[in-house]
Amino acid sequence: MSNLSRRNFITGGAIAALGGTLAIAGCAPKGESSSTVAGAAGEGAQAWTGTANGKGGELTVEVITEGDSIARINLLKSRESYGVGTAGIDVLSDLIVKNQTLNVDMVTGATVSSMAFLAAVSDAVDASGMKSSEWKKREKAVPQAPEGLTTDVDVVVVGAGGAGYAAALTAAEAGKNVVLLEKLGIVGGDTILSGGAMAVPNNWFQKRDGIEDSVEKMAEDMIVGGDHVGDPDLVNVICEGAYGAMEWLIFNGGVAWQPHERFFGGHSVIRSLIPEGNEGSGIICKLDKRAEGLKNLKVCRNTKADELVQDASGAVVGLKATNTATGETYDFKAKAVILAAGGFGSNVEMRMRYNPEMDEKILSTDSVGATGDCHVMAEKIGANLIDMQYIQTYPTCDTQTGALLYVGNMRLENRAICINKEGDRFVEEMERRDVISNAIKEQTDGIGYMIFNQDGLDHTDIATVNAAEMDGLFGRGQLAKGETIAEVCEPFGIDAAELQKTVEKWNGYCKDGADPDFNYRAALNPIEGGPYYILAYKPSVHYTMGGLHINTDAQVLDSDGAPIPGLFAAGEQAGHKMGTNRLGSCSITDVFVFGRVAGANAAALA
């Protein structure tokens, strides 16, 4: 559909012909300009456009009116994050059309996208001659609980991220009645915000490429990468279950993987699969669709877990929760409860309680929902917390917002080198995250930079997949482009003469096939010829290694090491698996392995 000026309109049959276009959905097929639809329009309808600035740039909507009503809303242009911003837009569009009001709350977890969408719709409503100010005074519309929700179930799962979906779907596939609670207005947790990479030893790409790997080798990498603090038994469960979890995602979840792998820091070999779309949304959206098709699984958004319920023997037999949109309270009765609500990276007070260095000056990549609520809730009934002082920072993050920078994956694609303001390399680019983060802190201004060129960028799909991110970084001065090294250094004040020497030295190492300075462990690719790019970055809190102490059956343990009957935990919610530091792509493996373990064992109790 071509763009319209905001005061032009289409009438009658032309709009009726749009009836078959794709309905809006937070996990609908991805694309910059999609047709987002809520409601239906008939003869006499008119179309009005409105525009606002969202998180990913300009957002344009088309509001279809019939008389004084909004018949539906089409999204003409959007670069909001797939499965996150788009999910918030989905919720608001549905509320607006069904309830004929603009008096709606922003969707938690997608606030910026929600605000932009509402502003654009308001703009279009004003263009139609109606007054958005009047629409905003109408009766408030709020999301409702799923139809047919019951509080007497077999299994309650808290947290609709990767671990939560794995647990809930596994229990539901075993024939149990399951409810999955999510306190935000969107699902996905940190999994949907991630790149979705999953470490899997002995996968078919390794066999195709002649890469020797084993469960034991991956387990050793994880244990060494965590300084031998993680529980080897828990690590072995993750590594042994990785291949099966990958197959489950394919055959039960419909997840598709790209035909290549990525090397992550701290691993001894390349073993990490990348989902279609290069994002965790390529996993979560498939699992959410699978959940929608199961009658015995209800996903409750805007529903916060408040209190675990125990019987006289101490067994967990239910959970109290509140719908934050409607104010309704629930007293769920269940045979088992699974906590999969992630870590506490977004809770500065809690971070500082366990590690005073992780103060408010350090931003976070994490979901706004990663606040440790369930850590506290479980601790109140005697659950043991372990390794809480170990908090990981991700090295290549936005210096202004703290968001993880996917352009920074040029490092993981072996197409960039890390430099400082003096123009020198200061760390091996494929080192552990904590090693790189600590090295960045020692550099001038606590900021690192990476340099790559157009040829390197063209060898990846990073520019295509992350176009909106790159545009934003250019606009805010965190990414620069220049025909020469001297030109690209200028915006950052980097020593161009020294960087020229550094790049020439690197290119020589690539020719020789060895890096005597830092022992680079992956493929050595030269940076020869412009245009050149430089990206500025700094570390942000990314993952909390500590959490509820569990055993290999995902049962939560008390301070004496005994299982608390009926209580399970999985994913970042559970600690003592990663040790002092997590290797990249092992979290996705963990959430789906232990999510399935928790789901299966909880189902066995029901």
Residue ranges and their predicted role:
Residues 1-17:
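N-terminal secretory signal peptides and thylakoid transit peptides that target proteins
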Residues 375-379, 383-494:
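An anion/pyrophosphate-binding glycine-rich loop and adjacent beta-alpha core
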Residues 151-153, 327-336:
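Core beta-strand elements of the Rossmann-like FAD/NAD(P) dinucleotide-binding domain
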